[in-house]
């Protein structure tokens, strides 16, 4: 029995607590940004509005604080949005937290000063001196995990032994875990698939989308290698696996369908998805300054088209 702290009360962070508790751990969840989160979920039924389920009775809810972070946990799980990484990084550095960290957040950061793309683990290590980081990625829809549907993910750490120790804490008969040392490749794949799922969604037929899927995989393979990741990672759970789930029906794919019909991003967002977060858009704006200047555009024409569509708010034009 281990003590696990999950930081982030959104759909994924909350769903993640379910296999952790089922594995007989003592699990606490906290939310830094929502003052009403703890109050709402501390009620008798613990109903989560995004997941549409009652969270486990044994799940503990705590107000986010420095004192909470300083308590003794065996694992701290970061399930915040990308914008929350700097916030939690500063907290972990200031409090000199040495507990094992598991990052669920997906995304990349453009460091303007050094004109370099950083993965989340690189951001935490370089900017905030956070060590002992593992990452968890793969094709996982929060609602399906919450319903205990079979879910396969991958934990990456330079030490496979460490990855297996974490797996032992959180895996169940339905939450199945693979291992990898390719931290960079897995983080790159899990981020850029949001952009490529928009591109695939832009196909106006299954025939067109399948062609875009194939070309997207080839571009993902090129970009993963460009950032020093491994080829095989693109073809694994964090690459093709996660891309399939996102393209099959996620928010990025949905936005892509509107772009494919001739809407600009802003027009589609305002008309059809005003309350939805489109991760691919956030990532596109983050990495465009680097990708459009540093990477061979001939190798990634789909990526280039989508980035230009987002940053200029013009109609999507794809040549295949």
Language-model features: where?
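General beta-strand structural signal in soluble alpha/beta enzymes
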Residues: 103, 132-137, 177-181, 235, ...
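Short beta-strand/turn micro-motifs composed of small residues
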Residues: 8, 30-31, 103-105, 137, ...
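Internal alpha-helical scaffold of NAD(P)-dependent oxidoreductase catalytic cores
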Residues: 91, 126-132, 150-233
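NAD(P)-dependent Rossmann-like dehydrogenase/reductase catalytic/cofactor-binding core
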Residues: 55, 193, 200-201, 225-235, ...
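Nucleotide donor/acceptor-binding cores
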Residues: 2-3, 99, 151
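NAD(P)+-binding Rossmann beta1-loop-alpha1 motif at the extreme N-terminus of oxidoreductases
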Residues: 1-55, 59-64, 70, 121
């Amino acid at each position: 029995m281990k003590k696990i702290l999950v930081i982030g009360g959104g759909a994924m962070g909350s769903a993640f607590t379910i296999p952790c508790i089922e594995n007989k751990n003592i699990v606490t969840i906290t939310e830094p940004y929502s003052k009403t989160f703890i109050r709402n979920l501390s009620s008798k039924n613990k109903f989560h509005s995004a997941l549409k389920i009652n969270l486990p009775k044994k799940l503990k809810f705590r107000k986010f604080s420095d004192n909470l972070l300083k308590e003794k946990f065996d694992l701290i799980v970061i399930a915040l949005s990308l914008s929350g990484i700097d916030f939690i990084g500063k907290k972990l550095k200031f409090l000199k937290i040495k507990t094992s960290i598991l990052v669920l957040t997906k995304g990349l950061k453009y460091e303007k000063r050094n004109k370099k793309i950083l993965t989340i683990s690189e951001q935490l290590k370089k900017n905030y001196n956070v060590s002992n980081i593992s990452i968890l990625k793969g094709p996982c829809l929060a609602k399906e995990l919450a319903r205990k549907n079979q879910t396969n993910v991958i934990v990456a750490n330079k030490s496979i032994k460490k990855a297996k120790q974490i797996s032992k804490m959180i895996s169940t008969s339905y939450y199945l875990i693979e291992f990898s040392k390719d931290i960079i490749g897995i983080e790159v794949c899990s981020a850029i698939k949001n952009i490529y799922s928009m591109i695939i969604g832009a196909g106006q037929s299954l025939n067109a989308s399948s062609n875009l899927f194939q070309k997207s995989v080839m571009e993902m393979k090129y970009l993963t290698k460009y950032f020093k990741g491994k080829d095989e990672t693109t073809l694994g759970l964090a690459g093709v696996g996660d891309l399939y789930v996102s393209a099959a029906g996620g928010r990025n794919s949905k936005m892509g369908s509107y772009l494919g019909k001739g809407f600009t991003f802003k027009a589609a967002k305002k008309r059809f998805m005003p309350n939805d977060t489109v991760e691919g858009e956030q990532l596109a704006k983050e990495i465009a300054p680097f990708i459009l200047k540093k990477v061979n555009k001939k190798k990634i024409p789909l990526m280039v088209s989508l980035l230009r569509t987002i940053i200029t708010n013009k109609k999507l034009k794809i040549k295949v």
